[in-house]
Amino acid sequence: MTSIEPTHTGKKVIVGMSGGVDSSVSAYLLMQQGYQVEGLFMKNWEEDDNNEYCAAAEDLKDAQAVCDKLGIKLHTVNFAAEYWDNVFEYFLAEYKAGRTPNPDIMCNKEIKFKAFLEFADEILDADYIAMGHYVRRRDNTDGSTQMLRGVDGNKDQSYFLYTLSHEQVARSLFPVGELEKHEVREIAKEMGLITHDKKDSTGICFIGERKFTEFLGTYLPAQPGNIETPEGEVIGTHQGLMYHTLGQRKGLGIGGMKNSNDDPWYVVDKDLERNVLIVGQGGHHPRLMSTGMTVNQLHWVDRTGPIDGCHIAVKTRYRQQDVPCTLTYTDEHTLRVVFDEPVAAVTPGQSAVFYDGEVCLGGGIIDQLIRG
């Protein structure tokens, strides 16, 4: 492997060490570039004493092994209180209101690039922080900093980082954003890092291996109700609207209906007032399709945002293909977005993230759907 010429001697970087391969290789690459590197392992969730759902202890062990191998110091910090107040309570409130939140986005906003950055600044005297996210940073000649999609289109994580400010991006390094995932694993293997073949973490960190319904039910009381067709026919019951999201197909328990065609059933709407789950047949059922949406709680990485009436791309969920759309501001906090073509399963509570080519501009929270 070719060595990288050190260019940043003396600059101190605190790497968020998760115990995974991406942060492991990030630390190695930054060392190769001449940075003074130290690791910081975050504990964001206080798991029950008698369960083994959370792999925090195993992850810490792996992070320590990698830091030992690289010869760098590993610090630990507990952000469980901040996580509960700023991420988990938001998660519960959104589900209670019938929406489908994305706690990973809130975790990045409140913990990884706020609490972590403040700790790295105030306690560890860092020049930069670094994370193993698949995004890129571009420093422009006018002094501005932009966030770009990761080189690996299948792993690009800019969708989860749209709430970062220009200042946060300028203080953050993303070494693996320039690489494909297979290259990251190859580097880890070549360097003898034990995380080289570690499985990627998936799902929500505080739920771990538990069933989602089981976990949510311990915090929010279930409210069973009817499942209806768009025509109002009752065809089953649900255990709680919070357990279902638009476009969901599995776990409805209504297969084999009489007088229905062979198309699978999908969640096409929720009637919160009546506590009714509305389902229709076919992945392109008219009630599942939206011609646009309103988006609020806007955040733009460079503070200014795209101009009114512009035609750009949006993602309404992770790994979705870019959706061409036109933006109109209804006020400074709300956008009306019209898609070029109807889109299925746009979900209130999820994030809409906007792009101009490679550049992640920012985004907001999907509020209302526009149909027809």
From Swiss-Prot:
<dbReference type="Pfam" id="PF03054">
    <property type="entry name" value="tRNA_Me_trans"/>
</dbReference>
<feature type="site" description="Interaction with tRNA">
    <location>
        <position position="350"/>
    </location>
</feature>
<feature type="region of interest" description="Interaction with target base in tRNA">
    <location>
        <begin position="102"/>
        <end position="104"/>
    </location>
</feature>
<dbReference type="Pfam" id="PF20259">
    <property type="entry name" value="tRNA_Me_trans_M"/>
</dbReference>
<keyword id="KW-0808">Transferase</keyword>
<feature type="site" description="Interaction with tRNA">
    <location>
        <position position="133"/>
    </location>
</feature>
<dbReference type="InterPro" id="IPR004506">
    <property type="entry name" value="MnmA-like"/>
</dbReference>
<dbReference type="GO" id="GO:0000049">
    <property type="term" value="F:tRNA binding"/>
</dbReference>
<feature type="region of interest" description="Interaction with tRNA">
    <location>
        <begin position="317"/>
        <end position="318"/>
    </location>
</feature>
<feature type="binding site">
    <location>
        <position position="42"/>
    </location>
    <ligand>
        <name>ATP</name>
    </ligand>
</feature>
<dbReference type="InterPro" id="IPR023382">
    <property type="entry name" value="MnmA-like_central_sf"/>
</dbReference>
<keyword id="KW-0547">Nucleotide-binding</keyword>
<feature type="binding site">
    <location>
        <begin position="16"/>
        <end position="23"/>
    </location>
    <ligand>
        <name>ATP</name>
    </ligand>
</feature>
<comment type="function">
    <text>Catalyzes the 2-thiolation of uridine at the wobble position (U34) of tRNA, leading to the formation of s(2)U34.</text>
</comment>
<feature type="active site" description="Nucleophile">
    <location>
        <position position="107"/>
    </location>
</feature>
<feature type="disulfide bond" description="Alternate">
    <location>
        <begin position="107"/>
        <end position="205"/>
    </location>
</feature>
<dbReference type="GO" id="GO:0002143">
    <property type="term" value="P:tRNA wobble position uridine thiolation"/>
</dbReference>
<dbReference type="GO" id="GO:0005524">
    <property type="term" value="F:ATP binding"/>
</dbReference>
<keyword id="KW-0963">Cytoplasm</keyword>
<feature type="active site" description="Cysteine persulfide intermediate">
    <location>
        <position position="205"/>
    </location>
</feature>
<dbReference type="InterPro" id="IPR046885">
    <property type="entry name" value="MnmA-like_C"/>
</dbReference>
<dbReference type="Pfam" id="PF20258">
    <property type="entry name" value="tRNA_Me_trans_C"/>
</dbReference>
<protein>
    <recommendedName>
        <fullName>tRNA-specific 2-thiouridylase MnmA</fullName>
        <ecNumber>2.8.1.13</ecNumber>
    </recommendedName>
</protein>
<dbReference type="GO" id="GO:0005737">
    <property type="term" value="C:cytoplasm"/>
</dbReference>
<keyword id="KW-0820">tRNA-binding</keyword>
<keyword id="KW-1015">Disulfide bond</keyword>
<feature type="binding site">
    <location>
        <position position="132"/>
    </location>
    <ligand>
        <name>ATP</name>
    </ligand>
</feature>
<keyword id="KW-0819">tRNA processing</keyword>
<keyword id="KW-0694">RNA-binding</keyword>
<comment type="similarity">
    <text>Belongs to the MnmA/TRMU family.</text>
</comment>
<dbReference type="InterPro" id="IPR014729">
    <property type="entry name" value="Rossmann-like_a/b/a_fold"/>
</dbReference>
<dbReference type="GO" id="GO:0103016">
    <property type="term" value="F:tRNA-uridine 2-sulfurtransferase activity"/>
</dbReference>
<feature type="region of interest" description="Interaction with tRNA">
    <location>
        <begin position="155"/>
        <end position="157"/>
    </location>
</feature>
<dbReference type="InterPro" id="IPR046884">
    <property type="entry name" value="MnmA-like_central"/>
</dbReference>
<keyword id="KW-0067">ATP-binding</keyword>
